[in-house]
Every structure is written in C-alpha cells, then in structure tokens.
Amino acid sequence: MVMFIERGIRGGLSQCSHRHAQANNKYMESYDPSKPSSYLMYYDVNNLYGWAMCQPLPYAEFRWVNDISNFDVNAIALDSSKGYVLEVDLEYPQHLHDAHADLPFCPARDKPPGKRQDKLLATLYDKKRYVIHYRNLQQCTRYGLRIIKVHRVLEFAQSPWLRDYIELNTRFRAAAKNDFEKNLYKLMNNAVFGKTMKNVRNHVDVKLLTKWNGRYGAEAMIAKPNFHSRSIFSENLIAIEMRELEVKFNKPIYVGMCILDISKVYLYEFHHEYMLPSYRDKCKVLYMDTDSLIYHIECEDVYETLKHDIARFDTSDYASNNVYGIPLANKKVPVLMKDENNGAIMTEFVGLRAKMYALKVDGKKVTKKVKGVKTNVIARTITFDDYIQCLEGHIEMTRDQSRIQLLHPEDSKVPRFHRKNIKLRNKKR
C-alpha cells in the first residue's frame, strides 16, 4: 500500500509549451494597429497548496476495494466521507490532442528523448497503471479521457481536517503589515505540506568519529556490511556514512500525494473551464510552473475581461488609480488567480526549457531565470538577447560560475573556489 501511494506522488508540473511570443496592444508605445491585438499575461495562483490542504484529505480506514467491477468514480461526491485513489489504464482519444496540446491531463514521470533522468512530462500518450486521486480522474473523464481498465482501488476515510488551521494562517497573512509576517504565515502552511512529503528512504546515518580503534571506532564502522562512504576532515576527525538497516514508514505521504493531485485540479480547471471557453483558439499557454501560467492571448482588451470576471482574480496589488479601471479586490483569497505584473504590460517572452526563460515588462527590469545559476551570474553575464540567440540559432552558450566549496576534504583542509561551467541552451525539436 505504501509503494502504491509512492507511485502516485508527482510534484508540480513545469514546462515550456511555446518558445517565443511578443505582445501587441493599445497600452504599448510600440503598438502596431495593422497587426492583431495581443497580450502576454503572467497568472499565479494564490496559496494553491493551502487551498488543496483545505479539501477533504485521508486520515484513516485504508482498505482495498474488493469488488471493482461496478465501481463508478463519477458517482463519488467531492465532499464524500470516503475517498479513493485508483490505479487505471487511460486512453487519450486522438480527437482531443489538438485541443489539449498546451496542457494535457495526467502528467507522468518519464525520460525525455535523449535524456537519462526521469522528468514529470505532460503528454498525450495513453497511460498504463496510472495511480490517480478520484477527483482528478473525474475531471479527466469530463474532458473526454476514457478509462480502459481499473486495476485497483484504495478506499479511505476523508475529511477537511486541516481546513481550520490553514484558514487561520491565511487570515493572519492577509492582515500582515510587513513581509516578515507574510512569509511566516506562508511558511506555517507550507511546512505542514513538507512534512507530509518527507521521504524516509532518503534518510542517512552519519557518524563523526575521532578514533580509529575500539567498538565504536572508525575501523569497526568501516568493517560493517552497511558501510557506505567516508570523508576525512582532519587527522583526528572523520565522517562515516552508513546505510540504514531498516526504514520506518512513519510519515503521512498519503496526505501529500492527495494534496499534489488535488492542487493540479484547479490549474486544469482554470485553463480548460475558463481560459479556453473565454478565448478559444486565441489563447495559448507559453509556460507553466507549479502554480503559475504564462499566456499569449489575442483579444482587444484582456483587462476588460478580467474586470468582468473579477470574482476569479486577486487584484489587490494593482495601483489604486490604474488605467484599466480595475477595482482592488479579493486580497490573498486562496485559489484565485493573480496578475504577477499587477497591470504592467509584458511585451515579450522567450523560453528555452523548464526553469529557463526570460521576459520583458514595461517599466521593470528584464526577468531572467536559469535554474541552478546564481542570481548575480545571471544579472552580470546573461542578457535577454542571449535567450533569443539560443532559440533562433539553435546554439549553446556557456558561462562560468564560482562558489566557495570544500572539495575532497581528505586532500585539503582549506575551502577553495569551485568553478562550474553552466550552459544556456535550446533543445531542438
């Protein structure tokens, strides 16, 4: 049962669906009326995991359902006292592929072409033995995916037992007067989620020893069958890492798995139930991360639509005298979308891959992101044009990054500079 839940744990989805886009609208100085009016919008969900933690979550009475031949997942209420996680085979019908190309349902871990490491990929392939929460499965079937076979069903008792705690911290955060308080109450929620996701398989046993001989000396530890590795810090100090002899599964990973799955429900709902019906084929996802979406939208005035559907958005950080006439509303309300630019016009976006993109916003510095690279290196050595060159020329650029790190401590007691070569590249399609 534990391994069944582990197979259903999939983190936040991060992908770059379209590589480059430019806005062209009446709020820009470079507006060209001869071209279609278009906007670049960067939406972020307020407290997505906080909202998911307020939903009914498992807490007891776990059991396998014996008779699954007549099991109807669509008959289960969202607030049912019983919840389910299913292992199913899913078919992704061909006629849905074009409509779902920007944001396919049911992301799965797999190796991208030419890569060795598994990544979370949103694909249009059929799914085999896919472990999924019943709410996500209900959403998938509503949008046309077909259940071919149900292999197993795990039943559990559920209730919104975390809701009061999460809502209390949310109220405190909305009333916070400074960034410290805002971050504190955000952490109070996120820390709970982090504990539900703790992987005890990764725990290590490290011993710091100062002697060679004896029952608890370095010699005895190295001779044990569960010895893993050692690092010598000095003549009289050594660290020895031992493999765990037993693993105690005492973390509620079933809660974390359900939170991750339920959180994806809202992002898919926003895209497929709101954005696509509102803009149809004039709207496409450029980039998405765990709780954010960057869109390219062709319309006359996206802010008029936002104003009309303000119940879906948090506009509390807009300027009080903004040119769009949008009222300030819904401050920090969970699971509402927020315009990350707060009305400032995003003029251009370029994305090379997940966690590697850049964007221009009128009146602000260029935003440049490269995962794993220090902020000062990005600011000093990488420009927006570098992203464009990598994209259009299919070239690879490199930069040097230095940090102080203790390398091979058995050879040297003194930390020294470590120079790492980082790459800015675009994968050919």
Feature-to-residue mapping (PLM):
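Conserved acidic
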Residues: M1-R429
